[in-house]
Amino acid sequence: MTVFEEIMQAPDKAVPRTYLKKAEALVVFPGTIKGGFIGGVHRGHGILSVRDSKTNTWSPPAFMTLTGGSFGAQIGVEEIDVVLIVLNQRGIENLLSNKFKIGADAGVAAGPVGRDAEASTDIQMRAQVLSYSRTRGVFAGATLKGSALTSDGNANRDFYGRQLSARQIVYEGIGSTVAPVPAWKAMLNRYFR
């Protein structure tokens, strides 16, 4: 079971169906490591998949990296699962720009959770991306201010057998025949209808 499936199994903690229906892309970073001593850093590897609005089908996964830092009195290490629900084409383009920073863009908001989260704030209604995180089984709207998302060229090359950009993978469908890709797309189709 994927991190996203685990999150969706708890209806009171899940991403509301309203946002799943509107989603144009999904980004999942399982097991992002966050650590700190005086200052803090976090780093994770994940995948991006984009929905084709004409065919309602999902792209093969493009591998991405999430990195960031923070200041202040911090000590310790924790593991966080991060989920980003991208609500429009502009949000996708920002993610693919390799200059995207969560928190630097007003288009990112902590996402609502649970069955009754339909009455969203104005910030969430204007957002391009809703962010969620889960730490030790607790799942809530995430604040990942300062985190940068970039394409993970090495992981894409290792998975697809050649150098591909995230844009080539999600828009041109290059790599759709790689064995695990159909299972990934089937999982997305179960939740994003």
Protein language model features and the residues they cover:
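Small-residue-enriched, tightly packed secondary-structure blocks
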Residues: M1-R193
